[in-house]
């Protein structure tokens, strides 16, 4: 902990701390130590050992304990992943991709030159037939934190996880036009989708058993109906539906789509399922209270991540080709503005997240059985990667990280990082008290005044707290409580709706 100035960031703690955590060679994807007085890039010899002591404490909000490079969902969990993993390609301070990471690229930002290094080079070639080829070459000195080398097999394994038909994490590489990807994914679907689309009265059990069908529809009729009814009840309470039987009105208000008059809660749940291809994890986004995973049996919930071959099986993606131990090509059917950004994907260790006995590139086996990511999903409590820091433990709301001496761009200057789950009310006072080094409170005029008061009326930058404001790409809205703003105590009446509309316009 520092005893003098602390820093408070109005952005993600990990994002602000990258430069502070980097070794002399720089940060994960923006490696530089720049002179503040000239446009020349300062150079320094990268250290191979971390600082002998020193702990940086970062305030975080809302750990979900899904510390996986494939399935992290919350911002706090993703911050842990960002510090323990390396991305195949990185970006500069303007968000532009760095394609020559091995030798590095020097780019100007706000009058200062910065040199960016990364794990790989990428050459993009637009071909005469309209296809686009990405030639990727890895550095040959990369190591995971356990000392194992990073090779192109780890990259290919990671890609196939992201492209698996049952993958339901936040990375959307499966939406890119990679040659052969549609055929690879469409040759398999999920068990939940098959049963749902067959219907409750189905008698053809070619792809699933009668017992599985019954278990699925029992879950829909019980937990699924309860899940949908909570949405309807919420809409009624807030004046967006007429009564507890108004599934059609609630579906419209919830932006689920149209249902006919007289539709039921079960109809609403089936509409939600269709909207999300019957992926129960994705359907959780529509909750009005309860988790769907708490309402339906665990084995049925797993149907949405269980792959079933339909038609002729396609074992590999034609556009992904290994060309060497440290090189590969990826080909798309057309120029895609998003493809290059998808290559910011983490390089996860095959030997840790996958099954090495199931990796045989020449025989279309990529570290797991297609359609079965259960082994990958099981590794969420302790991430492993080749990033700046190694995961030590998660205990009592704190993630403990240690400097990775094998980090390719030099060991971090800070020996330890503690990522501490912190309530919003404590994000400023924690910095003031010295229990937190870097925080990210929600900004407001009241917060600005509080910081200025702590700094002795010296403003947002003072002897106690240093503030850095970061642009936040988001949106805000103003909401009215239908329970409080209505006519005659009837939130759902047309007069009440007209009143709220008049106030907002």
Where in this protein do the model-derived segments appear?
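Aromatic- and charge-enriched surface segment that lines or borders ligand/interaction sites
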Residues: 113, 120-292, 329, 430, ...
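Short, solvent-exposed loop/turn elements at domain surfaces
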Residues: 64-71, 90, 96-99, 145-146, ...
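Bacterial Sec-dependent N-terminal signal peptides
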Residues: 1-11
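Bacterial lipoprotein signal-peptidase II cleavage site
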Residues: 21-35
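Hydrophobic core
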Residues: 16-20
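Gly/Pro-rich hinge or "lid" segments in bacterial periplasmic/extracellular proteins
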Residues: 93-96, 277, 281-318, 324-327, ...
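Extracytoplasmic/periplasmic ligand-capture domains
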Residues: 3-4, 136-168, 224, 306-308, ...
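N-terminal lobe/hinge region of extracytoplasmic solute-binding protein
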Residues: 59-129, 384
């Amino acid at each position: 902990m520092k005893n003098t100035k602390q820093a408070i960031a109005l952005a993600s703690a990990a994002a602000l701390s990258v430069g502070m955590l980097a070794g002399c060679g720089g940060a994960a994807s923006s490696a530089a130590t720049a002179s503040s007085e000239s446009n020349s890039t300062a150079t320094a010899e990268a250290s191979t050992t971390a600082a002998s002591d020193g702990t940086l404490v970062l305030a975080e909000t809302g750990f979900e304990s899904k510390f996986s490079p494939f399935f992290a969902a919350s911002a706090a969990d993703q911050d842990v992943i960002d510090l323990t993993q390396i991305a195949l390609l990185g970006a500069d301070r303007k968000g532009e991709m760095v394609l020559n990471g091995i030798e590095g690229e020097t780019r100007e930002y706000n009058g200062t030159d910065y040199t960016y290094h990364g794990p790989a080079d990428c050459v993009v070639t637009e071909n005469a037939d309209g296809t686009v080829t990405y030639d990727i070459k890895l550095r040959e000195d990369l190591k995971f934190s356990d000392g194992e080398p990073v090779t192109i097999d780890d990259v290919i394994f990671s890609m196939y996880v992201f492209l698996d038909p049952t993958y339901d994490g936040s990375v959307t590489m499966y939406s890119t036009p990679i040659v052969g990807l549609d055929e690879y994914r469409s040759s398999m679907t999920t068990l939940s989708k098959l049963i749902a689309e067959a219907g409750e009265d189905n008698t053809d059990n070619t792809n699933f058993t009668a017992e599985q069908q019954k278990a699925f529809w029992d879950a829909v009729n019980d937990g699924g109906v309860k899940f949908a009814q909570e949405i309807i009840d919420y809409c009624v309470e807030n004046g967006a539906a007429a009564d507890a039987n108004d599934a059609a009105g609630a579906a419209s208000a919830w932006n689920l789509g149209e249902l006919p008059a007289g539709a039921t809660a079960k109809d609403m749940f089936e509409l939600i399922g269709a909207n999300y291809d019957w992926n129960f994890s994705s359907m959780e986004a529509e909750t009005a209270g309860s988790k769907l995973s708490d309402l339906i049996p665990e084995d049925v919930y797993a149907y949405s991540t269980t792959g079933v071959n339909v038609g002729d099986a396609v074992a590999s993606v034609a556009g992904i080709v290994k060309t060497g131990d440290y090189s590969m090509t990826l080909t798309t059917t057309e120029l895609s503005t998003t493809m290059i950004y998808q290559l910011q994907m983490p390089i996860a260790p095959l030997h840790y997240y996958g099954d090495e006995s199931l990796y045989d590139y020449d025989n279309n086996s990529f570290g797991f059985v297609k359609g079965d990511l259960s082994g990958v999903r099981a590794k969420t409590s302790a991430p492993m990667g080749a990033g700046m820091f190694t995961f030590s433990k998660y205990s009592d709301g704190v993630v403990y990280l240690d400097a990775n001496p094998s980090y390719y761009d030099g060991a971090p200057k800070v020996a330890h990082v503690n990522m501490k789950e912190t309530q919003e009310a404590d994000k400023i006072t924690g910095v003031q008290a010295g229990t937190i080094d870097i925080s990210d409170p929600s900004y407001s005029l009241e917060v600005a005044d509080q910081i200025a008061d702590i700094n002795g009326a010296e403003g947002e930058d003072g002897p106690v707290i240093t503030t850095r404001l970061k642009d936040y790409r988001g949106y805000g809205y103003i909401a009215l409580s239908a329970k409080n703003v209505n006519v005659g105590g009837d939130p759902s009446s047309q007069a009440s709706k007209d009143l709220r509309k008049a106030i907002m316009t």
